[in-house]
Amino acid sequence: MIINLPDTNTSKIAAKIDELHEERGESATGRVLTLLIDTTLKELEHALDAANAASREHPCRVIAMVRDWSSEHTAERGEVVPNLDAQVRFGADAGAGEIIILYPHNGLVRHPDTLVIPLLVPDAPIVAWWPTNAPEDPAHDLLGAMASSRITDAQRADDTLKTVQNLRKNWSPQDADLSWTRLTPWRALLASMLDQPPHLPILSAKIVGPTHYVSLHLLAAWLKSSLHVPVEIVENPEAQAITSVTLEREDGTLSLTRPAGGDQALISLPGQAAQPIALPIRTLDDCLSEELRRIDPDEIYAQLVRDNPAENA
């Protein structure tokens, strides 16, 4: 169900949501959080698809703020005045929750916090998500300051390097970036490989992945911090994601390799036959669901962001 509310206000939007809940015989108290999405019109549907998928695991109210909405509202006297258009999605069009899309015009664009406050789920955590371009300092952004968790995605920003530098400079304990979340399966498999005997020291490591790929440099920083060994980064312009990690040990080479475009990896350990294992490239849905599952600060990510330069990301 999709309901358009042109030239409206937050009171009318809240009333419409209450009306729809009453018609369906349900309550909004089952929502575990409010997800604020600060996005563009171009990116809106892609972000909502991911939010819908994530809401099946985390029933939530999604409030999307589209701040590049270009139309204007002109009063009869010919003056441009602030106004708000909105859309409410329920049922099959909204996952396990409801979606509110706000299209502020003119001066309202500068006051997103006043628009979303009346629409928040009471007594529930607030998560702010910027699917592409993030503010320079998310913790002091008008929406970010309201949130108990802030999610960015530096890899999908227009200027990835600048975004990484800003996030590092203005890091806050509640910040997370999906470039780190994409590494969860790789880190789990590598940790599992190192848990197997013999527990000999790692001498060096090498990682292969795309050029200017944030996850590649985060994984290298994690290995360097965890193993205290030199890590070589090899950039492959044709790769779309990380393709291999190689660890050198006295008794031979340990490797985790995933062919470009593949969804299976190969684990090779000294003295053992190579083993195939599922390792698909993580989708945006996967990453967002993981971050909504873990709202608490990630101490390992925090250490990497604080202690490692971002110039090469």
Regions found by a protein language model. Name each.
Residues M1-L120:
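An N-terminal, globular interaction/scaffold subdomain
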Residues A53-A64, L120-V127, A145-I151, K224-V234:
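Structural alpha-beta junctions
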Residues A157, L161-D251:
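A contiguous, surface-oriented mixed alpha/beta subdomain in the mid-to-C-terminal portion of proteins
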Residues L227-H228, A239-A241, E250-A313:
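Long, compositionally biased intrinsically disordered terminal regions
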Residues M1-R31, D177-D195, S289-A313:
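Short N-terminal or domain-adjacent regulatory/targeting segments
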Residues L84-R89, D93, P173-T181, P197, ...:
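Extended, compositionally simple fibrous regions characteristic of intermediate-filament-like scaffolds
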Residues G97-A191:
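Internal, hydrophobic cores of structured domains that mediate oligomerization or house catalytic pockets
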Residues R61-S71, W129-T132, D153-A157, P230-A241:
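A generic structural motif
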